[in-house]
């Protein structure tokens, strides 16, 4: 007798990234799980090592990461972590997540985040890590 029930986290069954992500996304909101403290100097935003959960996908920063935010001297910048599942992911190379910067004259003037169902058929997902106030010397505040 065949069954439409398929085990996921059972012995001798395969757990895919989508299966794993689906579980996390249904019970935990996007965000920093630990570490990932933010500081700034001039146009440099520094993020310390830590763990994040974005779109149900767990990722980690293994070293201090510097994001240069130099596209504006007034207004605001929003720092995104963008997931793109069409990019490479191998045991040696991971290119499916990166930082992106958006700029706006107002703190609420940013476009809507792209949050496709990446644990289904979608391939793109954005998470707003922080919003920065910009000044003539670079980042004025987080």
List PLM regions with ranges.
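Beta-strand-rich solenoidal segments
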Residues: 3-10, 44-142
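N-terminal "first-domain core" detector
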Residues: 1-52
């Amino acid at each position: 007798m065949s069954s439409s029930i398929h085990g996921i986290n059972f012995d001798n069954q395969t757990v895919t990234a989508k299966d794993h992500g689906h579980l996390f996304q249904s019970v935990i909101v996007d965000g920093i799980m630990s570490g990932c403290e933010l500081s700034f100097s001039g146009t440099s935003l520094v993020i310390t090592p830590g763990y994040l959960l974005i779109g149900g996908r767990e990722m980690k920063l293994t070293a201090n990461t510097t994001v240069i935010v130099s596209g504006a001297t007034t207004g605001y910048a929003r720092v995104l972590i963008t997931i793109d599942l069409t990019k490479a992911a191998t045991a040696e190379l991971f290119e499916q997540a990166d930082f992106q910067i958006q700029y706006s004259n107002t703190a609420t003037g940013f476009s809507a985040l792209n949050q496709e169902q990446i644990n289904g058929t979608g391939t793109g997902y954005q998470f707003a890590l922080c919003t920065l106030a910009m000044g003539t010397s670079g980042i004025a505040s987080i």
